[in-house]
Amino acid sequence: MSVPGFWLEDGLPARALAPLAALYGAGVVLRRGLYQRGWLHRPASPVPVIVVGNLFVGGTGKTPLVAWLVTQLREYGWHPAIVARGYGGRAGKGPVAVTADSDPADSGDEPLLLARRCAVPVFVGSDRPATVQAAYQAGCDVVVSDDGLQHYRMRRDAEIVVLDAHRRLGNRRLLPAGPLREPIGRLAGVDIVAVNGDAVPEGDCVFHLQPGAPRAVDGSQRPWPGGEAHAVAGIGHPERFFASLQEVGIGVAERHVFPDHHAYSSQDLSFADERPIIMTEKDAVKCRDLPQADRLWYLPVELEPGCELTAAVSGLLTRLHAREGRV
């Protein structure tokens, strides 16, 4: 979702909404406390669960971190699966298995992207404990939850929160006065705070999203035609995508911003000229079958972890190994 400007500064609109934010915060704290104390039931989990989520509403780089974490788990000898809500899809309560050939209208865009990139079982559904159970029945011994930090009904063994280095915690206020889903104090109880971007304090667990060469959405090996392009973004933080295009030297004739998880139609991409159209990988998974597919490209990104993040995740997985009695 797009972030209102007043969420990034503590101005009059934010202060005017502070009473509503206080009510929202009280509800969040109460609900989490009820689950923690066992007054609301949380089903047992048959396998360890690692949640990768955020406090800040909107895009922070969470999905690339999930993909990287899955790779790390496999290197440690685990057989991971991914579970997600499937925002923008029709999975409902689920659980529904997602494969590389799934319809994004059913699975949602991010789960489909992860299914294609990670080659591990992916399940979606609003009932997170049920998706974890489905992953276990599929033969997995650890689950990574893409988002779900606030899904308190789902038991978890570790929590990783992702922050954007530029926006951090915005004006540090809760919804609707600010961008935060939970109080700032929640960060003290998570295992790792991973920061996406530059200009971060020394010691932060930082990572960078490194853009690569454009790839054709239809899967062909056509070379990038060059020249200026139409830049299309339907993600939570589109400015990061536009900055990545500039970083790799792709000129932008016009920007086209759509809502997060937007379901694209051919009309959305019907532009007056024949310039190439470049988009995010998350958008590309929904556009492969559109008539304009031969003009569509996406910009892949690879996560480059800093030393602190690599060490923190290594320590987390070592502790998880010991807890599960693995050698």
Curated annotation (Swiss-Prot):
Gene Ontology terms: biological process: lipid A biosynthetic process; lipopolysaccharide core region biosynthetic process
GO cellular component: a single term: plasma membrane
EC number: 2.7.1.130
Annotated pathway: Glycolipid biosynthesis; lipid IV(A) biosynthesis; lipid IV(A) from (3R)-3-hydroxytetradecanoyl-[acyl-carrier-protein] and UDP-N-acetyl-alpha-D-glucosamine: step 6/6
Pfam families named among the record's database cross-references: LpxK
Keyword terms, alphabetized: ATP-binding, Kinase, Lipid A biosynthesis, Lipid biosynthesis, Lipid metabolism, Nucleotide-binding, Transferase
GO MF annotations, alphabetized: ATP binding; tetraacyldisaccharide 4'-kinase activity
Function: Transfers the gamma-phosphate of ATP to the 4'-position of a tetraacyldisaccharide 1-phosphate intermediate (termed DS-1-P) to form tetraacyldisaccharide 1,4'-bis-phosphate (lipid IVA).
PANTHER family: TETRAACYLDISACCHARIDE 4'-KINASE, TETRAACYLDISACCHARIDE 4'-KINASE, MITOCHONDRIAL-RELATED
Stated name of the protein: Tetraacyldisaccharide 4'-kinase
Origin species: Halorhodospira halophila (strain DSM 244 / SL1) (Ectothiorhodospira halophila (strain DSM 244 / SL1))
